[in-house]
Structures are given as C-alpha cells and as structure tokens.
Amino acid sequence: QIFIEDFKKLVDEGKKESVRSVIKFMANSIQSELFTKCMYNDRNYQGIGYMRAILNSFLLDLSFDFWQKCNIHLKVQNTPIISCVWNHSRMIDGLMGLGEINKNPFNGISFAYNIHAFLIEPLGLVVVDNGNHSVNAAIVYNEGEIIVNTVIDISEVLEKYRFDEKKYVNIETNKKVNIKNLKNNSESFTYTFGLLFEMARVLKNAKDENGYVYYDVN
C-alpha cells in the first residue's frame, strides 16, 4: 500500500520520466527472473500455461473485444518490456548473435514477422509472447525498437478487481477471483505483477481525471 501511495505521488507531481523509469525497472526485474530460471533450466510453473499466466496477470477475464490491432514502433531503451523466454539455448543464441556488440543490431522491423507484442494500457507495458529470445537480447543490450501489433486497455478489469497483495479479488464482494490461467486461479504470476496491476489503476485514475499519460505511442 505504501509503495502504491508513493507511486501515486510521482504521477500526481507529473514526474513522467520517473514513472516510466520505475515501471521499466520493475519490468526488467521480472525479465531478470525469467532469464535466470530459463538459464538454469529449472522453470517450474506447474498447472498453468506459462505465457498465458503472465498476460492474464494483467487481463484477468477481459474480453477479446478489448484487443485492438495496431502498428506501434517503440524504442526498447524507453519501453518497459517483458519477453517470455522459455528455452535457454535459444536465449544464449540470441545473446551471441544479436546486438551492436555482435555487429548485428536488433532491428524490430526485420523481426516483425516473428514478434507478437501486446501493449498493456494504461500501464504502457509491452508483453511479448512470440519472438521472445530475440526481444530478450534487445532488452539485455537495451537497444533497437520493437513493433507492437496489439494494444489492450485493461481499464474495465481495473473497475472490477483489485490486487490484495496476494491474490485478485472482486472489488464489490471482496471475494477472490476464480479465473483460468492465473496462478492457483486467483494469484498474480509473481508479486511484482500484482503491484504493476495496482500501478495501472493509479495511471487509469490520472488519465480519467486529467488525461495523464506518461508515454507517447505516436
């Protein structure tokens, strides 16, 4: 609760670069966890679909009607991104073969055919569920740009649910949700995902009140 209150202060004070940096830092911490679990080949997320559980930590039971096609170019160095790496060999191949350091800069346009990326609004966070290992290399090297092809506004689920520091609950009834592809049908993939969900609420309220958006997709 204190963390969210402090984050709200950054938003209220119009500290857009600080807001962006905090969200990107948290996305990077998640990426680091996925990276290390994949590196040691010991990922153990039994009973749930790995990539769907990550995405559903933001979407919950949101209808596909809120999925909108788009073609948005975003710079990796400015954008919070979570890329769902799943194979340590492919991950290392990406790190060895891509990047300016390897004289092969990541080019989102060239890789667009293989990358599927979602922009989660109003959080301004990108989740990648295809082309994961190439995008992971771009995140590690902090370079290039990524093309987002689907934008999803989660404002509706923010009206219905909240994260209570362990699980998602219905705001009206205070009962935990029962949604397929969530951890134990009610929990965020990791605690950080739940925090990001509540940070999205802060950003939604600021947008509703005064049009506040910390990122630019134009």
Which sequence ranges carry the predicted segments?
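Short His-Asn-centered micro-motif
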Residues: V127-N130
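Short active-site loop/helix that positions an aromatic residue
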Residues: N132-I146
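Accessory, usually C-terminal, subdomains that scaffold auxiliary metal cofactors
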Residues: I147-N210
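N-terminal accessory interaction module
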Residues: Y212-N218
